């Protein structure tokens, strides 16, 4: 059996009026702006709603409507891989014509959905971060538990690496690099990376210590692309440590070209 890891996000929340009374059967419409993907939900008897299986990233726009209340619109929401975004909204009655309606959404710092130490690295961060080797091992250093490919003092060979839910592991311990035996995919193809350490989430299974969960980019309604040139040579390596001369550096040059196109 193959157990896929988490490849989606979720959103949940509560809708109430200014008196704190639950609003039942309010329509919640969530739109993924880059692709136009739409998700719908209806609040239950407690005024709560939830949507599972959503695309990671964003931006998302949330519109909440109910008879007798002004529409509530919340924009520029970004979802993290494997996390539930909590959005609590207070709606304003629309008895008379209003010049302006201000809707305030809150998100608790203490989420019951947290299931362990997690670090999410978004596509915006992946684009901005410098990387010497253009590999996952450079990126996961953003996790405070990371030491190379090992986490919380564990051996890097026990780290679980999944891409779009599929395991890419070095099960026989024959590789000295990633659990999958090297960089399995171009960094430009990755949409988001999640680093988890000893999670107690039943969806994250079949490993001990640390897990790296990555998802690739998917199509949108906008045609776009990226391009890069990665160059490394002996002039970028030092030949002296303190006062010790390590000798002349040998020729060691490597140039990698790459590009992506999608829409």
Enumerate the predicted regions with their spans.
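Periplasm-facing N-terminal accessory domains of Gram-negative outer-membrane beta-barrel systems
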Residues: 2-111
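Membrane-embedded beta-strand positions of outer-membrane beta-barrel proteins
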Residues: 225-229, 261
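Short helix-loop capping/hinge motifs at secondary-structure junctions, enriched
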Residues: 221-222
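Periplasmic N-terminal accessory/gating domains of Gram-negative outer-membrane beta-barrel systems
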Residues: 44, 50, 70, 75-90, ...
